[in-house]
């Protein structure tokens, strides 16, 4: 059903819309547009629209979202694990350095006492 600003297409655009779509023009816009009949969509009603396909698309979108959430969780977990592992290595390395310094100074102290 056309609005006040829409007019049916003239003979020059007779076959513009496909699959039974109705062609309309808006005088201020140079190109025509289509109002598609049921089960068709697209700029020129060129695509078949199956109601089940929208359900399938929603299902695929949900599956993609779940997969993305799992992937992000795994990445965060791996990052956390690596950071904690790196932190413990750094802490034990510092402890090793402190022990090495203490051992060295104790050894040096003992060697001075022996002379």
From Swiss-Prot:
Purpose: Low affinity ligand for the ERBB4 tyrosine kinase receptor. Concomitantly recruits ERBB1 and ERBB2 coreceptors, resulting in ligand-stimulated tyrosine phosphorylation and activation of the ERBB receptors. Does not bind to the ERBB1, ERBB2 and ERBB3 receptors.
Domains (record comment): The cytoplasmic domain may be involved in the regulation of trafficking and proteolytic processing. Regulation of the proteolytic processing involves initial intracellular domain dimerization.
Organism name: Homo sapiens (Human)
Occurrences of domain EGF-like (ranges): 5-46
InterPro entries the UniProt entry points to: EGF-like_dom
Disulfide bond annotation, renumbered to this chain: 9-23, 17-34, 36-45
UniProt PTM: Proteolytic cleavage close to the plasma membrane on the external face leads to the release of the soluble growth factor form.
Chain segments annotated as transmembrane: 63-83
CDD domains reported for this sequence: EGF_CA
Protein name as it appears in the record: Pro-neuregulin-4, membrane-bound isoform
